[in-house]
Amino acid sequence: MAIVGLGTDIVEIERIQAHVARAGDKLAKRVLTEAELAIYTAHSQPSRYLAKRFAAKEAAAKALGTGIGRGVSFQHIHIGNNEDGAPTIHFTEGALTRLQQLKATVGHISIADEKSYAIATVIIESQ
């Protein structure tokens, strides 16, 4: 396997909290898939959850080499968790098309947060 994409993003959680306080769920509805939005609304720390998903999707778009808005939407990237709780990444629509153009077969993701920041790194591999 060869690495064909690498992306990292960091988000200030307080900035997300301020946006949510000012605009409600507008950002969450733009960034999160329906499944992620359901988790967000039930989460004990919704702004922290949103910040981590925002960082993860930005990192994924960077790993794809497009960024958000060049055929890849936040909605085309779903961040979930496996049965052990580790984050997983799934691509659909424009993100999946780009993944196929890269001849990539797998994406790896790491997400972390500490007090004020959320950070994510995505590695995309091809065979």
Curated annotation (Swiss-Prot):
Pfam families linked to this entry: ACPS (PF01648)
Localization annotation: Cytoplasm
GO biological process: fatty acid biosynthetic process
EC number: 2.7.8.7
Reaction equation(s) it catalyzes: apo-[ACP] + CoA = holo-[ACP] + adenosine 3',5'-bisphosphate + H(+)
SUPFAM superfamilies according to UniProt: 4'-phosphopantetheinyl transferase
Coarse class of the protein's main subcellular location: cytoplasm
Family: Belongs to the P-Pant transferase superfamily. AcpS family.
Protein name from the UniProt record: Holo-[acyl-carrier-protein] synthase
Species annotation: Shewanella baltica (strain OS185)
